[in-house]
Amino acid sequence: MKYLAAFLLLGLAGNSSPSAEDIKTVLSSVGIDADEERLSSLLKELEGKDINELISSGSEKLASVPSGGAGAASAGGAAAAGGAAEAAPEAERAEEEKEESDDDMGFGLFD
């Protein structure tokens, strides 16, 4: 994904045919080492394709993907009263763990 993002960034900046060196320069500017095999594979796949057509094609494909809609079913609705008292501290611990793991707010740019 990071290679594609660098390719598209270069294309949108006016470089209609980014080379492997151009992509490596963009990636190294943010501290990422480029993998030659992946980079050459990407360039082979995108060779001769227009960046704007790729973006519009991708947008059309994303529009057809379902996003959310149905809510998750509640699994603990019929718990006994004694079990509910024990579940509360457990839920607090799970919430605390979740908060700690979301330090990057779910955004892992170029991961």
From Swiss-Prot:
<comment type="subunit">
    <text>P1 and P2 exist as dimers at the large ribosomal subunit.</text>
</comment>
<feature type="region of interest" description="Disordered">
    <location>
        <begin position="61"/>
        <end position="111"/>
    </location>
</feature>
<dbReference type="GO" id="GO:0003735">
    <property type="term" value="F:structural constituent of ribosome"/>
</dbReference>
<dbReference type="GO" id="GO:0002182">
    <property type="term" value="P:cytoplasmic translational elongation"/>
</dbReference>
<keyword id="KW-0597">Phosphoprotein</keyword>
<feature type="compositionally biased region" description="Low complexity">
    <location>
        <begin position="72"/>
        <end position="88"/>
    </location>
</feature>
<protein>
    <recommendedName>
        <fullName>Large ribosomal subunit protein P2</fullName>
    </recommendedName>
</protein>
<keyword id="KW-0020">Allergen</keyword>
<comment type="similarity">
    <text>Belongs to the eukaryotic ribosomal protein P1/P2 family.</text>
</comment>
<dbReference type="GO" id="GO:0022625">
    <property type="term" value="C:cytosolic large ribosomal subunit"/>
</dbReference>
<keyword id="KW-0689">Ribosomal protein</keyword>
<dbReference type="InterPro" id="IPR027534">
    <property type="entry name" value="Ribosomal_P1/P2"/>
</dbReference>
<dbReference type="Pfam" id="PF00428">
    <property type="entry name" value="Ribosomal_60s"/>
</dbReference>
<feature type="modified residue" description="Phosphoserine">
    <location>
        <position position="101"/>
    </location>
</feature>
<keyword id="KW-0687">Ribonucleoprotein</keyword>
<dbReference type="InterPro" id="IPR038716">
    <property type="entry name" value="P1/P2_N_sf"/>
</dbReference>
<dbReference type="InterPro" id="IPR044076">
    <property type="entry name" value="Ribosomal_P2"/>
</dbReference>
<comment type="function">
    <text>Plays an important role in the elongation step of protein synthesis.</text>
</comment>
